[in-house]
């Protein structure tokens, strides 16, 4: 690397150190289908080892959003990596796909090896939990694009599902049951509003809320639903699924419904984490609007036949996931979702 390039603000030695620090974390995520190692121009994955007859690839990309600002301000960088993976793999999971591999993109004002390592550790932890190989990535130092200490994180996930097992909305019918899987908290959406309310409240984020520091509550990583949902899919016919992200219930649940059908959701059938009550009170936000912004305690939904509902709840409980029968499917030409109890 030329001195001229270093004089322009790019610290190549810090980049080398970051790669060295992250390599042990990345190695933990490897699957037998991965061909070769790190450092190539392109990452390779052998689909023939999946033992699928007609595999369909499913891809998704996402970022963490302004939740990053809280992590940066308070120097807690590891959980953000979990968020980056969860936002991608939970999305592709809605098709019934098993996540196969993940690639990350980290852009920053200046490469700080210790910070990059923390981010990649979180990414790797989530990849290990979901059996997803971290097979590539990019760390870009762009001093003119970001303020000092700032960075952005995004990810890209690819999964596969047998063509005959692909989950869409084609089998959704009247009378089927909506099961909600509990969220771990706010997850990774609505943080522009969250940060506004934090600033207006003047709270000390080191102070306790519900027996935990506020900052830990706000940075609680997005829950990974891959293992429990794939375990459920092996035992029960799933008709449709939703990842409750930006837009809350109102924008996400209708995405899994065919025209002419609606989900009737009883909001009293599941507990709402206390942090949502705090946000609502702090911002004087209408309850309907809360359900149009946040997950309100339900991070993922599955639709099953009524006869399978009890069994599905039992399987999810065995997977250590809190789940609730939160509603049912009905015919409705005028709306795709009804919320009771708001």
UniProtKB/Swiss-Prot annotation:
One of its GO terms (molecular function) is ATP binding. GO terms for biological process: 'de novo' IMP biosynthetic process; adenine biosynthetic process. Pfam families: AIRS (PF00586), AIRS_C (PF02769). InterPro entries: PurM-like_C_dom, PurM-like_C_sf, PurM-like_N, PurM-like_N_sf, PurM_cligase. Its EC number is 6.3.3.1. It catalyses: 2-formamido-N(1)-(5-O-phospho-beta-D-ribosyl)acetamidine + ATP = 5-amino-1-(5-phospho-beta-D-ribosyl)imidazole + ADP + phosphate + H(+). It is found in: Cytoplasm. Its main location: cytoplasm. Keywords: ATP-binding, Cytoplasm, Ligase, Nucleotide-binding, Purine biosynthesis. GO terms for cellular component: cytosol. PANTHER family: TRIFUNCTIONAL PURINE BIOSYNTHETIC PROTEIN ADENOSINE-3 (PTHR10520:SF12), TRIFUNCTIONAL PURINE BIOSYNTHETIC PROTEIN ADENOSINE-3-RELATED (PTHR10520). Belongs to the AIR synthase family. NCBIfam families: purM. This is Phosphoribosylformylglycinamidine cyclo-ligase.
């Amino acid at each position: 690397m030329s001195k001229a390039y270093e004089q322009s603000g790019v610290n190549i030695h810090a980049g080398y150190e970051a790669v060295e620090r992250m390599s042990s974390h990345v190695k933990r995520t490897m699957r037998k289908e991965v061909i070769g190692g790190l450092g190539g121009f392109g990452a390779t994955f052998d689909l023939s080892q999946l033992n699928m007859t007609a595999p369909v690839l499913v891809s998704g990309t996402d970022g963490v959003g302004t939740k990053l600002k809280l992590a940066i301000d308070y120097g807690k960088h590891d959980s953000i990596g979990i968020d980056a993976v969860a936002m991608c793999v939970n999305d592709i999971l809605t098709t019934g796909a098993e996540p196969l591999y993940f690639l990350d993109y980290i852009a920053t004002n200046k490469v700080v090896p210790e910070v990059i390592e923390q981010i990649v550790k979180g990414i790797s932890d989530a990849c290990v939990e979901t059996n997803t190989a971290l097979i590539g990535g990019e760390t870009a130092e762009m001093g003119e694009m970001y303020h000092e200490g700032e960075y952005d994180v995004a990810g890209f996930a690819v999964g596969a599902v047998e063509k005959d097992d692909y989950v869409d909305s084609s089998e959704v019918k009247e009378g089927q049951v909506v099961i909600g899987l509990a969220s771990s908290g706010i997850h990774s959406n609505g943080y522009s509003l969250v940060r506004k309310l934090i600033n207006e409240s003047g709270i000390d984020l080191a102070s306790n809320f519900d027996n935990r520091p506020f900052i830990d509550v706000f940075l609680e990583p997005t829950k990974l639903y891959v293992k429990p949902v794939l375990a459920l899919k092996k035992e029960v016919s799933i008709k449709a699924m939703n990842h409750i992200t930006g837009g809350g219930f109102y924008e996400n649940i209708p995405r899994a419904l065919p025209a002419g059908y609606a989900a009737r959701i009883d909001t009293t059938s599941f507990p709402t984490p206390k942090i949502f009550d705090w946000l609502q009170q702090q911002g004087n936000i209408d309850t309907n609007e809360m359900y149009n912004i946040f997950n309100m305690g339900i991070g993922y939904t599955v639709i099953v036949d009524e006869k399978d509902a009890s069994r599905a709840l039992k399987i999810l409980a065995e997977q250590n996931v809190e789940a609730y029968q939160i509603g049912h499917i009905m015919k409705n030409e005028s709306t795709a979702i009804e919320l009771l109890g708001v």
